[in-house]
């Protein structure tokens, strides 16, 4: 039997989810990618940071509750600067001030209940984005599986599942890790991306199947 967990993630200061194609300007996704949420769950559960095998057991959805204010700041990073032959350089980094998200995580009921307890009492300190981007996890609930057909959803939407008619953003988010089997070993060789429509609410051209979590309609 499966169940779905819903939790609220409040960022008290700021956070940033770097888009990897940027170089001198580190732009940010408007929501934490699926891989970032899995990292949060791994920290709560005490899973090894290089063990991604549990991703196959979970389906993850993200709800944008409050986008936060986007600002630009400068950060010094350690990198060889040829101009003055020092190990430093400045990059412009976008940050999101006090955004609020919700996550939905579906899986086997026992595992979901274990994750829910871990989010309330995490094994490691929790962050969202960079290691010093503090996050507060609130309102952790577990729901039974309940589906509905709807033209209005409250979560981000995989690009291939529907077409929004209201204003949205489209981003290609990291959703998992590519692995290669080498004998008895599995090595992680890259990152898998998927297109997502992103908005706080979406009105769609056609009804699609979604999960009911209280009043929220979520696509995983």
Predicted feature residues:
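N-terminal, Lys/Arg- and Ser/Thr-rich interaction peptides
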Residues: 1-23
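Extracellular structured ligand-interaction cores
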Residues: 4, 57-59, 98-100
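Beta-strand secondary-structure signal
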Residues: 6-8, 61, 102-104
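Primarily extracytoplasmic ectodomains and periplasmic/lumenal surface modules that are beta-strand-rich
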Residues: 13-16, 47-48, 111-112
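Glycine/small-residue-rich interface belts in oligomeric ring/scaffold proteins
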Residues: 18-82
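Internal, well-folded beta-alpha domain core
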Residues: 67-220
């Amino acid at each position: 039997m499966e169940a779905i967990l819903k939790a609220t993630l409040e960022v008290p200061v700021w956070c940033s989810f770097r888009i990897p194609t940027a170089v001198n300007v580190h732009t940010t996704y408007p929501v934490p990618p699926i891989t970032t949420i899995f990292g949060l769950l791994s920290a709560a559960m005490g899973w090894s940071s290089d063990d991604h095998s549990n991703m196959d057991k979970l389906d993850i959805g993200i709800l944008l509750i409050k986008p936060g204010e986007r600002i630009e700041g400068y950060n010094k990073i350690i990198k060889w600067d040829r101009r003055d032959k020092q190990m430093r350089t400045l990059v412009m980094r976008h940050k999101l001030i006090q955004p609020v998200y919700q996550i939905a995580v579906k899986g086997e009921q026992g595992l979901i209940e274990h994750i829910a307890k871990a989010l309330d009492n995490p094994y490691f300190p929790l962050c969202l984005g960079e290691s010093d981007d503090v996050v507060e996890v609130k309102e952790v609930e577990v729901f039974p599986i309940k589906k509905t057909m709807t033209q209005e959803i409250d979560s981000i939407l995989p690009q291939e599942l529907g077409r929004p008619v209201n204003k949205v953003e489209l981003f290609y988010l990291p959703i998992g890790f590519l692995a290669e089997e080498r004998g008895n070993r599995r090595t992680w060789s890259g990152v898998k991306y998927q297109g997502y429509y992103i908005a706080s609410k979406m009105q769609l051209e056609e009804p699609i199947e979604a999960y009911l979590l209280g009043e929220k309609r979520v696509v995983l």
